[in-house]
């Protein structure tokens, strides 16, 4: 099994190192990640300048671009590595519900959708304990399970792991994406030169977050797994829109 690893927290993030340390025991790995934190980068590509690729002291590859840039390059013939699947993470915070629209972690995994094997995006629902080893063990177990029982290609498994020791994990639950409330207003600050600057507010609290959603299990020390893909079509709106379009003819 040949894995391409990436993330959005940056090439030096502890979650990426923990993931690489665990997965190298069960697979051949290659790591390519942004040279700095690109949280919230979503599926953006760098198209207005060339990218720089450097090798770190750990043997990882660092790119001065987005998570999607990294996986795009890592899967290219130029990179010379015939990866079978992409694993992205371990993100330092949750990627639940609407978070997947903004997440560079999920985007990096999604860029691996063209491979025959499903990609994995893994996040630690941080409670300040930094149990990255727990999340890494969960991913290793999922990969070994998929070898025995493959699932549909062009699928991304969005995995959220409670920030607890492995022995406190109660199990795994299959979930759908929940929803968050809208985030707060941008926070205004003034820099030392008197200029106004703004911080984007944190994500909103869970709204549709009950049983069956990805929010619920992690609050009860279960791992949440949500299968996602790129088709964002709202199929249940077809009939209403068809009626509306018919009225305009």
UniProtKB/Swiss-Prot annotation:
Co-factor binding comment: Binds 1 divalent metal cation per subunit.
Keyword Glycoprotein among record annotations: no
Pfam annotation, one family: SurE
InterPro entries: SurE, SurE-like_Pase/nucleotidase, SurE-like_sf
Keywords in alphabetical order: Cytoplasm, Hydrolase, Metal-binding, Nucleotide-binding
Enzyme class name: hydrolase
GO cellular component: cytoplasm
CC cofactor: a divalent metal cation
Gene3D superfamilies per record: Survival protein SurE-like phosphatase/nucleotidase (3.40.1210.10)
UniProt superkingdom: Bacteria
GO molecular function: 3'-nucleotidase activity; 5'-nucleotidase activity; exopolyphosphatase activity; metal ion binding; nucleotide binding
Amino acids binding a divalent metal cation: 8-9, 39, 91
Enzyme Commission number(s) from the entry: 3.1.3.5
Subcellular location: Cytoplasm
Reactions mediated catalytically: a ribonucleoside 5'-phosphate + H2O = a ribonucleoside + phosphate
HAMAP family the record matches: SurE
Functional note: Nucleotidase that shows phosphatase activity on nucleoside 5'-monophosphates.
Family (UniProt): Belongs to the SurE nucleotidase family.
Protein name as catalogued: 5'-nucleotidase SurE
Gene source species: Hahella chejuensis (strain KCTC 2396)
Native organism taxonomy: Bacteria, Pseudomonadati, Pseudomonadota, Gammaproteobacteria, Oceanospirillales
